[in-house]
Amino acid sequence: MLTFVTGSLALERADKHYAIMDNDWYTAGFVPYLVALDGDVEILGLASDTANTWQAQGALHAVATLEAGNLSCIPVYSGATWPLINTPNRFHAWEMIHGVLPWQGAFAPENKTLEAEGGDPKSGDPNRIVKEAFKEGFPKGRPENSTSAANFMVEMVHKYPGQVTIYSAGALTNVALAVRMDPQFASLAKDLVIMGGYVDLNMLQATGNIMQADHQSDINLMIDPEASKIALTADFPNITIAGNVANQVFPTKEFLEEVRSVPNPYSELFYKYYDLSFPFWDETAAALMVDPSISVNQTSVYLDVDTSYGSPNYGNIHVYQKALAPPGIREVNYVFEVDAERLINRIKHALQYPKSCADFE
């Protein structure tokens, strides 16, 4: 009997789906990890990166939002503060030649007025913390200081080979560092799922309004183009790209009210602070990680990232068929459309009935 039980537990662990979720966390940024937990994915840790704001601020947002819902049993690991090469000055010099991006993320000019009003920090000192931005409450805890996000990723794929999804909905800096640190890292992961990687949207950027142009800009890849190329050409068993599809489904006021009808700390924060101007970007990628079958239209293509600083497409992706692909790139799964109803229902259930640390005891 003991042998049977032990064997059953070992089999259960071998079938377990783990994830490390890397993002530029913010007040309402908790939905992706709630979606993952609701889908029985065990989150080994959250990682912070520099994309919409500096990673130090994002890491504390991760800690704070976990505390809000009794999820502090999930550790947070600080990622790289700086992209591999890019800096605010270098970014703005590129813009002088190729045009201004509608959303500049952490590289937007420093604005003390906006910070005083609750905006997350941009440019300036990357390690400064703007407490006014923590509408979810300033955290009591802090990120883990035992190791870095990239080191943690490497350690976990060795501990659970073939079982750990690397989810990235911000810059790919930490993933690229892990790829370069350990030649086995990517191949030992289960897969890589990212939010970002838009294709064929230049005309919409040019003819739409500024908000529509914002929806089509690719700051997650463009803030660290070199890291994006390293990560998206690495030998992960599978890479799923939630690019254009992430713009498919938008929240509505009615949906926020429906979520709030089941009161808990997360449904309340979602109701108060989720911006209706933006689609379910990160949530779409998280749902695809949990249940790839929500994709109803996808294709396999070879993908590269433009790392030429002199190019107007610096940081954007380019896709190829196999016969025309250059050497050194790989095939990815590019999702065009998801089942919107299933996505909405998954988000709603995760918010209305969120998991907590008590569920893992």
For the regions a language model picked out, list residue spans one by one.
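A charged helix-plus-loop insertion that forms the helical arch/lid used to bind
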Residues: 92-116
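Short, surface-exposed amphipathic charged segments that create phosphate/polyanion-binding patches used
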Residues: 90-99, 206-209, 256
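Ligand-binding beta-strand-loop-alpha-helix segment within the catalytic cores
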Residues: 73-75, 102
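Fungal secretory targeting signals
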Residues: 1-10
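Short, active-site-adjacent cap segments at secondary-structure transitions
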Residues: 83-85, 174-175, 248-249
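A short, structured active-site edge motif that brings together acidic residues
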Residues: 77-83
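Conformational coupling and interaction surfaces
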Residues: 11-18, 31-43, 213, 219-361
